[in-house]
């Protein structure tokens, strides 16, 4: 029988470069997925808030008729949007941490939880609430009280 042994020389520097390229590609893909998810989530929040404004038109009209300022109504709806997205962000961080620990326990892979990243995630969700809550809040603040009360 022919028993030949073959050897393959590998340059560790080239392997490290390939691993770095793969890591960079993966990070880029994850950033795109996260960005698209945030955009879709933000649009969802905006739609929910627009529906809320529509359903509460008479309430807004009544508040304006008894003297509520535009700024107060704008801040009310903006606060609701920020609370909604903050709770979503907090729930997402908690779910992510729990999932990381479950996967870690199954694969015996250590988990490192970044408090800074968790805080950034919740703050970013608040920013999404502000950005995507502006249009519905502005719409609510600028409703004409007479038209709003007439719709009831």
Regions found by a protein language model. Name each.
Residues 1-30:
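Mechanotransmission and gating elements of multispan inner-membrane complexes involved in transport
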Residues 17, 46, 147:
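Glycine-centered loop/turn positions within well-structured domains
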Residues 20, 58, 150:
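A short local structural element in Rossmann-fold oxidoreductases
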Residues 28-104, 108, 112-132, 136:
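Transmembrane alpha-helical interface segments in multi-pass membrane proteins
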Residues 137-152:
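Short cytosolic juxtamembrane segments of multi-pass membrane proteins
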